[in-house]
Design a protein with these regions (language model features):
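Cysteine-centered catalytic environments shared across enzyme families
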Residues: 1-168, 172-173, 177-180, 451, ...
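Conserved aromatic-histidine-acidic binding/catalytic patches
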Residues: 83, 87, 109, 137, ...
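ATP-dependent adenylate-handling ligase core
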Residues: 138-197, 210-234, 241-242, 277-278, ...
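General alpha-helical segment detector with a strong preference for membrane-spanning helices
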Residues: 117-123, 213, 217, 321-323
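Adenosyl-5′-phosphate
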Residues: 23-27, 53-54, 58, 238-465
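Conserved adenosine/adenylate-binding substructure
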Residues: 105-109, 170-220, 253-311
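Short, solvent-exposed helix-helix connector turns and helix-capping sites enriched
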Residues: 17, 229-234, 346, 439
Length: 465
């Protein structure tokens, strides 16, 4: 059986004993070095998994007759001498063709946010005269993202519903949630896991805007930075401080050779050096993200959508990836192409608030700099002070904080006698205390990874019986 992966994979394939599987399988020997990387970042790199004898099929690779070969295509940077207006024209033709090919004749379910990716998709779907329903979800006690979703839906004349991520949903559904993504990323972060049963009640194909913000923006890096500086910038992007502390601690607990920091640097240097893009660190880091971050983190959590319905990700399209490689970084920076697309087709939508730059829109977001944005920041702070509570901005605040949540967290880490076969109670207690008594913001990632590791071990034990 021959199976080929696209430039950004749309499915996860596992390889074991020269066979390929399109569903979760387990290996026999744990890969503790790779698990440490996973703990520090929240996802695996390359083709690594929890096991030494289990790999995944890499991007642009083909599996045939027991062997994986590739890549058939490489990320590169070959900017053309072309005007911005012509680039936008090309984007319009390409993007709307992708949307038409994927959704023609289908009912579409479009999750909306206050950003640009779903807004851009909304216009492309409208231009193709497709049947669309929309929804937005937001944290209870958090900023009301549905406000922006409703503005966008109304401007496009789409029906819209609003849903709230509630405290403590995780504990009643943790087994199902952990099995859906195989524990390959921590499952507290993806809010869509809160709505598995709601998604089942919908009718249509999910149209997801993931990865538009990576393809159509950059980090604004200088072209003359060194390779070593690129590595350290990349390291700062993907490693979580609390996760690094946890990975470093368990590296020593597990008696692994050398030092975790050296191993991590070597891994990043190796992966980054395989991307043959010189003179454009923005392009190379975008390529790294698309080779590792997209398939090993983003794609894993899209399984929560795929659990109930077919999923399409237009920004994952091969032709769009190839297009990006020919666009000058100047045009890719600061979301210029998407902004111009929205302005051309829907000035009314462009006037709606861009959440990232609230209260500004696509015509005046340039004013979102100090001191021009100071009046709004003052008013917003006063509003939050009057509410007399911290605004919820991350899911762990709703799932880990509070008496009932804390008891559930404690029980899952200590009382179920699953995690201690991998991590000593002493180590779990250390990070539990760092989270509950020291710095919850820094150590929320570490505690979430321990919870995910516990569920992985639980599911592994069940699989072995």
């Amino acid at each position: 059986m021959s199976i080929s992966n696209s430039i950004i994979p749309k499915n996860i394939y596992f390889i074991k004993d020269n066979k390929i599987y399109n569903s979760l399988v387990y290996g026999s020997e744990l890969d503790f070095e790779s698990i440490c990387v996973w703990l520090s970042t929240g996802f695996f790199l390359g083709d690594t998994t929890f096991f030494k004898d289990l790999k995944v099929l890499k991007p642009s690779h083909t599996f045939n007759n027991g062997t994986s070969t590739g890549p058939e295509w490489d990320w590169h940077y070959a900017p053309r001498n072309i005007s911005f207006s012509n680039i936008v024209d090309e984007f319009i033709d390409l993007f709307e063709t992708i949307v038409k090919d994927r959704f023609n004749g289908k009912k579409v379910i479009l999750p909306l946010s206050g950003g640009l990716d779903s807004r851009t998709l909304g216009i492309a779907l409208q231009n193709n005269q497709l049947d669309v329903e929309t929804f937005t979800y937001y944290f209870q006690g958090g900023h009301n993202e549905s406000y922006y979703g409703k503005l966008i839906a109304d401007a496009l004349q789409y029906p819209h519903k609003s849903y709230v991520v509630e405290p403590g949903y995780l504990w009643n559904d943790i087994d199902r949630i952990s099995k859906i993504n195989g524990s390959y990323t921590e499952f507290t972060h993806p809010r869509q896991a809160a709505f598995l049963d709601y998604f089942n009640s919908l009718d249509g194909v999910f149209c997801l805007g993931h990865w538009g913000d990576v393809l159509f923006d950059n980090l604004g890096l200088d072209n003359d930075i060194t390779f070593e500086e690129e590595v350290q910038i990349l390291k700062s992007l993907i490693i979580k401080k609390g996760g690094y502390h946890l990975a470093n601690t368990l590296w020593e607990v597990w008696g692994l050779n050398g030092h975790f920091d050296d191993y991590m640097n070597e891994q990043l240097e190796s992966y980054l050096s395989l991307i043959k893009i010189n003179g454009s660190p923005n392009s190379r880091i975008r390529a790294f993200k698309s080779l590792h971050w997209a398939p090993r983190w983003n794609l894993v959590n899209l399984e929560y959508f795929r659990y109930s319905h077919q999923v399409e990700m237009p920004y994952y399209d091969d032709s769009l990836c190839k297009f990006i490689c020919s666009v000058p970084e100047e045009y890719l920076s600061s979301r210029k192409i998407q902004i111009e697309y929205i302005k051309r087709f829907s000035p009314a939508l462009a006037k709606q608030t861009w959440q990232e730059h609230r209260p500004f829109n696509l015509y005046n977001y340039h004013f979102d700099t100090f001191p021009l944005n100071l009046p709004y920041r003052i008013i917003d702070k006063i509003r939050r002070i009057m509410k007399n509570k911290d605004q919820v901005s991350m899911n762990w605040q709703l799932q880990f904080l509070g008496k009932v949540n804390n008891q559930n967290l404690y029980d899952n880490l200590f009382e179920k006698d699953v995690l201690r076969s991998l991590v000593p109670d002493k180590t779990v207690k250390l990070f539990y205390n760092l989270f509950t008594k020291n710095n919850p913001k820094v150590y929320a990632h570490a505690i979430s990874m321990l919870l995910t590791l516990s569920q992985f071990q639980k599911n592994l034990i069940i699989n072995e019986k």
